[in-house]
Amino acid sequence: MKYRRHEAKDYSRQYMRGIWAAAATPFTPDDLAIDEAGLRRNIRHWIDDLGIDGLFIAGKQGEFFSMSLPERKRLMDIAVEETQRADLKGSGAKAKAQTIMSASDQNLDTVIELARHAEAIGADYVVVHAPTLHFHNAHDDCVLQYYEYIASKVGIGIALWSHPDNGYLLSPELCARLAEIPTVVAIKYSVPREMYARLTRLARTKIIVSTASEDEWFDNIVELGWQLYLCSSPPYTLQTSVDRRMRAYTDLAFAGKVEEARGVRDSLDPVRDAIRKTKPAGKPYAHQKYWQELLGQAGGAVRRPLLELTEAEKAATKAAFEACGLRLSDTKRAAAE
């Protein structure tokens, strides 16, 4: 690993920053196998062209729930290989982007196995979502011991993840207790803003707090002093190689150029609206993958129980995409040439 157990918090505070993206997994349309070549192209595009700082691999966006254990490990392997390429665009730089691997599972043995695999192959961190606890009316002690146990079995830095799908949310106070675990370094806190703002105040020096909402990212930099967007798909669905406005407003906000950053952030509203208005309520995965295809990325198919878009839904999405204002090519350069 790149750090020792007792260095996990300091390492993450220094390097776990910027824009991270939750990687979707492209599946081939014929046999629904992982499209490894397509995934590699996507990762190179996200890092080299879009300037994404880190990748969240094999999470919910990546459809981990429909994958075998070997498939989840394979995604991790590919991500480490691509982010640690010896020469990215001729720069000679190594590990231009970091990785956080989802070891989330209801089976604790699987969590440990995936976390150990991530550690062995050189991933930077793992993320483990809070366990689903059936019939529980109180969960704090169970969750605390759950993460303490995982941390006792692996040395890699751990990010917590609390989201409504679990049937409950971790309180800011419980998260602050969890932040005392030496290798707990961050949390993806998919909760109302007042909850993650409170946790930021309670435990800022012990845990990096973030949430997946891109709509709130700018405000969280400016008002809460956040350093990390962890994370969802907007870093690669709102941007192209010649239209990196999320990267731009993030860097401006980090530099304290708040009003300039706000203007760039607001200019993306037509893109956000196009995505929201055309996304069928029951087909978020297929919609995102089709949007990726329109961007020239490998989107691919979804696995059951997820559903594909109809031709009418694709047509509506394409029309909105073409009108949203995202630039796909450098028109000024093309005209000059």
Report each predicted region and the residues it spans:
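Short, intrinsically disordered/low-complexity patches at protein termini
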Residues: 58-59, 134-135, 184, 283-287, ...
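General structural feature for long, well-ordered alpha-helical segments within catalytic domains
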Residues: 35-42, 71, 75, 110, ...
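C-terminal alpha-helical cap/extension of soluble enzyme domains
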Residues: 2-9, 15-26, 49-52, 225-226, ...
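Conserved, mostly hydrophobic/aromatic
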Residues: 31, 46, 79, 118, ...
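Catalytic alpha/beta core domains of metabolic enzymes, predominantly
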Residues: 149-152, 164-272, 276-280
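Active-site beta->alpha loop and helix N-cap motifs at the rims of alpha/beta catalytic domains
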Residues: 2-167, 305-308, 331-334
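Repeat-unit-sized solenoid/scaffold elements
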Residues: 129-144, 188-204, 227-229, 292-298, ...
